[in-house]
């Protein structure tokens, strides 16, 4: 799937936050996809119809950005394009809770979040603080299954060991590095990469989500080998993504049935 993406780079419409734009765009470029950071409500809907996939991240939310998100999500849904929701800290304020409720009504095909975000999104009590998760991934697995069934979507919970489910099937993905949470917006960039893989294999969104997370995990392991800390890890991670090929990914991905 990684090689297929590079042979035919998908145009990925990324509505993400200010903090994430640079790293998200570079992650897509290093992986072989084509990013577009378009969020104005005057054009977001039209652009979503042009792109191969849409990703929506509510990290730095505003009324204007939310209008763009709704317009893009409506366009993606009506045209059958995959779209990914990243409900960053949706539990933190009433504005965020309502925004995510509105976006969930537009039926995202994939939802990616940390454990605290997924637990809360499924109706549970999470220990999240701001954008940071205080819950381990394993405690979010049942919540992810329920959310996937309720939304008829793929749900990915990312953390030390990632978890992906469609409500019936479920897998865990191991790998990555302890340095990854120390680089801001890597999770947001992962959401965009999930969109790129979904655009490449819209007929297999479960497999596309797993492939994106496995790509991040393997690249994270490679980047950590020579990194002295989060600063050198960040640029090494982009190099590792660019150097990774499909054969190495297939050989090294640590995916197990959950």
From Swiss-Prot:
<dbReference type="GO" id="GO:0005524">
    <property type="term" value="F:ATP binding"/>
</dbReference>
<protein>
    <recommendedName>
        <fullName>Hydroxyethylthiazole kinase</fullName>
        <ecNumber>2.7.1.50</ecNumber>
    </recommendedName>
</protein>
<comment type="similarity">
    <text>Belongs to the Thz kinase family.</text>
</comment>
<comment type="function">
    <text>Catalyzes the phosphorylation of the hydroxyl group of 4-methyl-5-beta-hydroxyethylthiazole (THZ).</text>
</comment>
<keyword id="KW-0067">ATP-binding</keyword>
<keyword id="KW-0547">Nucleotide-binding</keyword>
<dbReference type="GO" id="GO:0009228">
    <property type="term" value="P:thiamine biosynthetic process"/>
</dbReference>
<feature type="binding site">
    <location>
        <position position="37"/>
    </location>
    <ligand>
        <name>substrate</name>
    </ligand>
</feature>
<keyword id="KW-0808">Transferase</keyword>
<comment type="pathway">
    <text>Cofactor biosynthesis; thiamine diphosphate biosynthesis; 4-methyl-5-(2-phosphoethyl)-thiazole from 5-(2-hydroxyethyl)-4-methylthiazole: step 1/1.</text>
</comment>
<dbReference type="GO" id="GO:0000287">
    <property type="term" value="F:magnesium ion binding"/>
</dbReference>
<dbReference type="InterPro" id="IPR029056">
    <property type="entry name" value="Ribokinase-like"/>
</dbReference>
<keyword id="KW-0784">Thiamine biosynthesis</keyword>
<dbReference type="Pfam" id="PF02110">
    <property type="entry name" value="HK"/>
</dbReference>
<feature type="binding site">
    <location>
        <position position="112"/>
    </location>
    <ligand>
        <name>ATP</name>
    </ligand>
</feature>
<feature type="binding site">
    <location>
        <position position="185"/>
    </location>
    <ligand>
        <name>substrate</name>
    </ligand>
</feature>
<keyword id="KW-0460">Magnesium</keyword>
<dbReference type="GO" id="GO:0009229">
    <property type="term" value="P:thiamine diphosphate biosynthetic process"/>
</dbReference>
<keyword id="KW-0418">Kinase</keyword>
<dbReference type="InterPro" id="IPR000417">
    <property type="entry name" value="Hyethyz_kinase"/>
</dbReference>
<keyword id="KW-0479">Metal-binding</keyword>
<dbReference type="GO" id="GO:0004417">
    <property type="term" value="F:hydroxyethylthiazole kinase activity"/>
</dbReference>
<keyword id="KW-0614">Plasmid</keyword>
<feature type="binding site">
    <location>
        <position position="158"/>
    </location>
    <ligand>
        <name>ATP</name>
    </ligand>
</feature>
């Amino acid at each position: 799937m990684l090689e297929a993406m590079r042979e035919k780079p998908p145009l990925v419409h990324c509505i993400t936050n200010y903090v994430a734009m640079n790293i998200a765009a570079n992650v897509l470029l290093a992986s072989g996809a084509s990013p577009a950071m378009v969020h104005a409500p005057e054009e977001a809907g039209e652009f979503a119809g042009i792109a191969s996939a849409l990703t929506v991240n509510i990290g730095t939310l505003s009324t204007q950005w939310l209008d763009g998100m709704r317009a893009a999500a409506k366009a993606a849904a009506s045209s059958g394009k995959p779209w990914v929701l990243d409900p960053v800290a949706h539990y933190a304020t009433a504005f965020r809770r309502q925004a995510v409720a509105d976006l969930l009504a537009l039926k995202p095909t994939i939802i990616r979040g940390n454990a605290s975000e997924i637990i809360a999104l499924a109706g549970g009590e999470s220990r999240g603080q701001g954008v940071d998760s205080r819950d381990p991934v394993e405690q979010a697995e049942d919540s992810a299954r329920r959310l996937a069934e309720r939304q008829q979507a793929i749900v990915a919970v990312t953390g030390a060991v990632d978890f992906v489910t469609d409500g019936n099937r479920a897998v865990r993905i191991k790998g990555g590095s302890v340095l990854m949470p120390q680089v801001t917006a890597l999770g947001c960039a992962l959401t965009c990469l999930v969109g790129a893989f979904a655009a490449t294999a819209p007929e297999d969104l479960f497999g596309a989500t797993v492939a994106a997370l496995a790509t991040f995990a393997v690249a994270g392991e490679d980047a950590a080998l020579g990194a002295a800390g989060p600063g050198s890890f960040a640029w090494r991670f982009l190099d590792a993504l660019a150097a990774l090929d499909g054969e190495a990914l297939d050989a090294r991905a640590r995916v197990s049935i959950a």
